[in-house]
């Protein structure tokens, strides 16, 4: 809403306020805390703008927002990837955690999905409060010749884009018609939230619309440009709650990672060079690659066995909270 000058001034003010937070993050001594503020506070701030503005009006803001989020992440990683590696790492960082990314959702990609969802969520409310005006909007949206108002033309274009990218595969069937939305069609209740992640809009249609866009981008734009090893890594770190550790609050030793270890984990997820000291594996003597593939797979070094300890400690804490007496490292006789 508003003139082009008003929109530009408003979005520039938003960018300036966002930058005030982004400037502080690289100065923090705790990388895990800085990451949480970037992922859960700075990145989602774009959602209000991309829901309220048509994609063409939100484009300049979304591009600037995404660029500043990526620049801040590079500062936290103390590394600036270039060329194809940089493009792929940036693409991976914007994917939801369940699709193998870091969850720093790209506002440009979210914009059409969010704008369509805002209208999908609002049509019934408009009908209840302003039925005459709502009927005019519905007729305009259903017109085969295209809507008269630019905002309605843009939401029609967003709906067509979602259809082309496979909305029917998002888990709720075909995209609802404008009349169905007008009459109050709602997505199924998210009782099982294993598929959703912190920061996702789960109260309406945006989750399914955004999921359509993210899945299409992953399968048709990002993965075809990856090597076989990179695709395998991306798939192995995908799935419900596969990235839950990224949003763990460091309130106990079990959920806390040192800055060096946390940076290694972030780089590994983006397939960027790791902070390694040895040139050869201490187990089998093979040369170590800078992406950590050998270290993650070598069965001779004993590192695979060490993965069990954190899981044991987590279950020990659960049992202890339930009142059980838990003993660690008990010898089996």
Language-model features and meaning:
Residues 1-333:
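Nucleic-acid-interacting cores, centered on viral/eukaryotic replication and modification enzymes
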């Amino acid at each position: 809403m508003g003139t082009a000058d008003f929109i530009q001034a408003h979005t520039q003010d938003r960018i300036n306020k966002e930058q005030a937070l982004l400037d502080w993050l690289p100065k923090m001594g705790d990388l895990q805390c800085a990451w949480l503020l970037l992922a859960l506070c700075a990145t989602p701030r774009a959602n209000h703008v991309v829901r309220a503005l048509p994609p063409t009006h939100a484009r300049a803001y979304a591009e600037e927002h995404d660029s500043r989020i990526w620049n801040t992440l590079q500062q936290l990683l103390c590394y600036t990837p270039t060329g194809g590696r940089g493009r792929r790492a940036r693409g991976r960082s914007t994917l939801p955690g369940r699709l193998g990314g870091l969850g720093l959702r790209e506002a440009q990609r979210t914009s059409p999905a969010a704008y369509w969802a805002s209208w999908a969520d609002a049509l019934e409310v408009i009908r209840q409060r302003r039925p005459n005006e709502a009927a005019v909007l519905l007729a305009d949206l259903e017109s085969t010749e295209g809507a008269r108002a630019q905002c309605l033309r843009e939401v029609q274009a967003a709906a067509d884009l979602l259809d082309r990218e496979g909305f029917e595969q998002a888990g709720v069937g075909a995209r609802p018609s404008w009349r169905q939305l007008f009459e109050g069609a709602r997505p199924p209740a998210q009782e099982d939230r294993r598929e959703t992640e912190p920061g996702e809009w789960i109260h309406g249609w945006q989750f399914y619309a955004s999921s359509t866009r993210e899945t299409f981008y992953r399968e048709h734009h990002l993965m075809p440009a990856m090597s076989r090893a990179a695709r395998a890594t991306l798939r192995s770190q995908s799935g419900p709650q596969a990235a839950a550790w990224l949003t763990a609050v460091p309130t106990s030793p079990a959920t806390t990672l040192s800055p060096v270890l946390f940076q290694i984990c972030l780089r590994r997820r983006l397939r960027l060079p790791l902070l390694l000291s040895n040139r050869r594996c201490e187990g089998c003597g093979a040369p170590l690659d800078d992406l950590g593939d050998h270290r993650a797979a070598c069965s001779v070094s004993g590192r695979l066995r060490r993965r069990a300890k954190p899981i044991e400690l987590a279950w020990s804490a659960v049992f202890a909270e339930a009142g059980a007496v838990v003993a660690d490292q008990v010898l089996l006789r």
